[in-house]
């Protein structure tokens, strides 16, 4: 698997659940998002959104989020904007029956704030007529969509307050 998604093997996916059962197939879906052709990647992202991103969140959601951040930051991933949108969906989702899952998922999304800020601030490359556009360059197809999705997610992270979040339980009181 190389360095991208290499840490997936450290997660006990078979012990986690998503909306339709065991999360054991999540690593394969993440791999298809990372390396699949456009139709394969799109289908995998759609599957993952149904499994972990639609309300409610599951125990596998928080385990998946760090890998979504990794994909969002990897220039060769085809739909990085879609990955960022899935992270925003997770931040807005919850599970009233399992508030710890909600908090873990929201914390995992918030932990990637620096990545969202970097992606949102990526400079636009100056236009050079006739110059080829390299994958991952600021003018590559989808680069503006990534900047826009990252800016939306960054704003959502900054607005997200656990006390105001209906999906999040109140944090424990701090001892003084």
Predicted regions mapped to residue ranges:
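Arginine residue identity/basic-tract feature
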Residues: 9-12, 32, 50, 78-80, ...
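Alpha-helical solenoid scaffolds in large eukaryotic transport, assembly, and signaling factors
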Residues: 2, 9-74, 80, 84-96, ...
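Positions within the helices of HEAT/ARM-like alpha-solenoid repeats
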Residues: 39-43, 60, 64, 78-80, ...
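Eukaryote-biased recognition of C-terminal alpha-helical segments
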Residues: 109-124, 136-164, 169-172
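Actinobacteria-biased recognition of intrinsically disordered, low-complexity terminal regions
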Residues: 1-24, 127-138, 165-176
